């Protein structure tokens, strides 16, 4: 039976990583890949904000998880106000790669979604992709760098900006759209925890109820986003190549993320 980075037995559907004060952490391993195989456990993790982590959470990240690279997709004003908590002094490569709707858009978090109770998530994700090519390609290159694994990437909720990057990574290596959409929808299991935490923080107060507006988590949203990515760009791999990733780097991404059979 495969094991995760903590050495515990895993199955493909058992990808949650539990922490005391980080609510929405999943290993990107165990997902099916077209033409056979699965994604590799213990390499890349997606997460909600880790800023409230405890000493025990830190010990798990630096020990069993083996965290070496933290990719922060939040905007500069979020980083300034919310910070990193204990991770601020950790021996971890920390890289801020803001994901926003356009290179010219405001760097204020509130401008990502002016009305959090009413938002077209497919349109938002398409704009985040278009406005953040440099950050997303840079994030992919950090994932490729096997000398600095494991990698954890996060935003605030671990759903939207994190979901776009996860979708690009997984689609680029051949994970089927249905599996990517199912992974995206898993955040719904933890959204009540995420909402309560974020609503208590200065940058995010006033969030709508769970499953409403920006807090919606439906697999169909990700299916539609991936369909648009395919129709407009030929899929994530072609989008990354158009954004400056080389064919050699794309091959290395696949080698890093796909487990040998």
Regions found by a protein language model. Give the residues of each.
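Ser/Thr-glycine-rich phosphate-binding loops at phosphate-binding pockets of nucleotides
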Residues: 157, 161-162
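Cys-dependent protein tyrosine phosphatase-like superfamily
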Residues: 1-152, 164-261
């Amino acid at each position: 039976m495969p094991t995760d980075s903590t050495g515990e037995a895993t199955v493909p559907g058992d990808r949650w990583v539990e922490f005391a004060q980080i609510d929405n952490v999943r290993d990107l391993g165990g997902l099916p890949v077209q033409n056979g195989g699965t994604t590799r456990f213990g390499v890349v993790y997606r997460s909600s904000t880790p800023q409230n982590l405890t000493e025990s959470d830190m010990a798990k990240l630096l020990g069993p998880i083996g965290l070496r690279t933290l990719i922060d997709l939040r905007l500069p004003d979020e980083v300034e106000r919310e910070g990193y908590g204990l991770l601020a002094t950790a021996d971890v490569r920390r890289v801020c790669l803001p994901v926003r709707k356009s290179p010219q858009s405001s760097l204020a978090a509130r401008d990502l979604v002016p009305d959090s109770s009413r938002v077209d998530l497919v349109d938002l994700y398409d704009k985040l992709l278009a406005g953040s090519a440099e950050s997303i390609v840079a994030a992919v290159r950090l994932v490729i760098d096997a000398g600095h694994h494991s990698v954890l990437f996060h935003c605030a909720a671990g759903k939207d900006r994190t979901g776009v990057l996860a979708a690009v990574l997984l689609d680029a290596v051949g994970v089927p759209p249905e599996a990517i959409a199912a992974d995206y929808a898993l955040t719904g299991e933890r959204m009540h925890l995420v909402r309560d935490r974020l609503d208590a923080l200065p940058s995010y107060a006033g969030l709508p109820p769970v499953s409403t507006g920006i807090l919606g988590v439906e697999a169909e949203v990700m299916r539609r986003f991936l369909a648009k990515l395919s129709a407009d760009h030929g899929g994530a791999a072609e989008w990354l190549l158009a954004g400056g990733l080389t064919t050699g780097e794309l091959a290395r991404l696949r080698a890093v993320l796909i487990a040998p059979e």
